[in-house]
């Protein structure tokens, strides 16, 4: 334990937090191995950006619907079961892509819907468990360390998958990689049995939580911020990987891009989680947002593998600066909101609805612009307009404030014991 302290710093961790980090790490590796190449796999069959946009639109449309259904279920059954449902649907997605083979591009809506359902179930459960297991003093550590695990997976997964796919003939490499991802998902399910049961009672109060936007300005600001976060993520999540493949025509080059991006991100997340203090959260969010938008201009007018790699380095620095304080800020806003203990699931669901609403609007705008203009004009224009989403996050979070009155810095745990929260300012391309 003393050696662990030297690595993570002066942070008190419990078994539940460590198990949740392990599950998140397994998920990240499974996704990093396979998901990086799905858009390229479909691109090689279709060759149309509009088709990729429709596929991703199906994903982000099903996610909020599934979040709503998962939220209602989580009021009746253990959240860990919801987590397992998500992993099962993710496994079904990779199996469906594998079984569809060369006809996958003709089933874009169905395949995307399955993945959207998997994401919805998994992330609802993971986010709720994160809120319940972490505390204000450990949230920055958890978010930062989760970023380190994701970055580690991002380094290992794409380069390994790219090497295997490029070395094996036909679709054999995809079969191997998808099978390995399924094994990691299965292990994540096994690890979930070590999590303490955390039942939630009561009725689903989504309408009341939505109504809180009228009386709780912090909640209104943070949900608006999530809409604009989704505005960028909607199209960037699938365009960049395809750009790399188009420039290089190599899955191994795409894996190299992922390796470089994640290697930088690994260190950036580590230092962000250790160095960004609560009073500096908003400045960090602004700096991260500006870096992410500024990096876009590296590839907007001239695109090559070298400029894409440079872009990858800059966003690997920008995302930790933005997300580590931003995600912690979000969870602290929820933790101090009315009925936070009873309605934590509803708060998570509504947050995701705003995030995915931004993604849906992003992809719809992209489809409209590309349909009206040629791709060589429409795509750069879409990137320039929709990429502004991350800098705009700061506009909404800059005025978030917390009162410091007696009794307001306490929230109640499920077991009825008080969890003291500090009077702070107050918790992410997929």
From Swiss-Prot:
One Pfam family of this chain: MFS_1
Region of interest: Disordered: 407-430
Bilayer-crossing regions: 18-38, 49-69, 80-100, 109-129, 145-165, 175-195, 235-255, 256-276, 285-305, 307-327, 353-373, 377-397
Gene Ontology cellular component list: plasma membrane
Signal peptide start and end residues: none
Gene3D superfamilies, alphabetized: MFS general substrate transporter like domains
A single MF term (Gene Ontology): transmembrane transporter activity
Alphabetic keyword roster: Cell membrane, Membrane, Transmembrane, Transmembrane helix
Annotated membrane topology: Multi-pass membrane protein
Superkingdom classification of source: Bacteria
Compositionally skewed regions (Basic and acidic residues) per UniProt: 415-430
Subcellular location(s) per record: Cell membrane
PANTHER family in alphabetical order: INTEGRAL MEMBRANE TRANSPORT PROTEIN-RELATED, MAJOR FACILITATOR SUPERFAMILY (MFS) PROFILE DOMAIN-CONTAINING PROTEIN
Listed name of the protein: Uncharacterized protein YqgE
Organism expressing this protein natively: Bacillus subtilis (strain 168)
Encoding gene (name): yqgE
């Amino acid at each position: 334990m003393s050696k662990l302290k030297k690595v993570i710093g002066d942070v008190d961790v419990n078994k539940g937090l460590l198990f949740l980090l392990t599950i998140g790490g397994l998920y990240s590796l499974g996704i990093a191995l396979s998901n990086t190449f799905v858009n390229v796999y479909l691109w090689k069959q279709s060759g149309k950006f509009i088709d990729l946009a429709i596929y991703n639109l199906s994903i982000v449309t099903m996610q909020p619907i599934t979040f709503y259904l998962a939220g209602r279920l989580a009021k009746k059954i253990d959240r860990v079961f919801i987590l397992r449902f998500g992993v099962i649907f993710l496994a079904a997605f990779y199996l469906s892509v594998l079984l569809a083979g060369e006809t996958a591009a003709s089933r874009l809506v169905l395949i995307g819907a399955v993945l959207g359902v998997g994401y919805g179930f998994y992330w609802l459960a993971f986010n709720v468990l994160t809120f319940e297991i972490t505390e204000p003093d450990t949230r920055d550590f958890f978010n930062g360390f989760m970023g380190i695990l994701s970055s580690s997976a991002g380094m290992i997964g794409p380069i390994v998958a790219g090497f295997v796919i490029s070395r094996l003939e036909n679709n054999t490499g995809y079969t191997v990689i998808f099978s390995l991802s399924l094994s990691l998902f299965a292990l994540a399910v096994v690890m979930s049995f070590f999590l303490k049961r955390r039942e939630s009672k009561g009725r689903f109060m989504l309408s009341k939580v939505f109504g809180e936007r009228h009386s709780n300005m912090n909640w209104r600001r943070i949900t608006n911020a999530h809409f604009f976060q989704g505005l960028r993520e909607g199209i960037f999540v699938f365009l960049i990987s395809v750009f790399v493949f188009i420039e290089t025509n190599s899955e191994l080059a795409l894996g190299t891009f992922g390796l470089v991006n994640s290697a930088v991100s690994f260190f950036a997340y580590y230092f962000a989680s250790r160095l960004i203090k609560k009073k500096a959260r908003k400045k960090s969010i602004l700096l991260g947002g500006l870096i992410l938008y500024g990096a876009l201009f590296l590839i907007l007018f001239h695109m090559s593998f070298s400029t894409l790699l440079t872009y990858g380095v800059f966003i690997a620095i920008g995302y930790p600066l933005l997300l580590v304080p931003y995600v912690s800020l979000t969870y602290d806003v929820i933790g101090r909101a009315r009925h936070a203990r009873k309605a934590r699931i509803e708060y998570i669901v509504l947050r995701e609805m705003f995030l995915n609403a931004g993604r849906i609007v992003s992809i719809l705008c992209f489809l409209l612009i590309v349909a009206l203009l040629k791709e060589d004009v429409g795509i750069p224009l879409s990137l320039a307009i929709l990429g502004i989403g991350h800098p705009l996050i700061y506009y909404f979070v800059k005025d978030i404030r917390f009162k410091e009155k007696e009794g307001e810095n306490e929230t109640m745990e499920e077991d009825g014991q008080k969890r003291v929260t500090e009077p702070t300012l107050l918790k992410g391309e997929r």
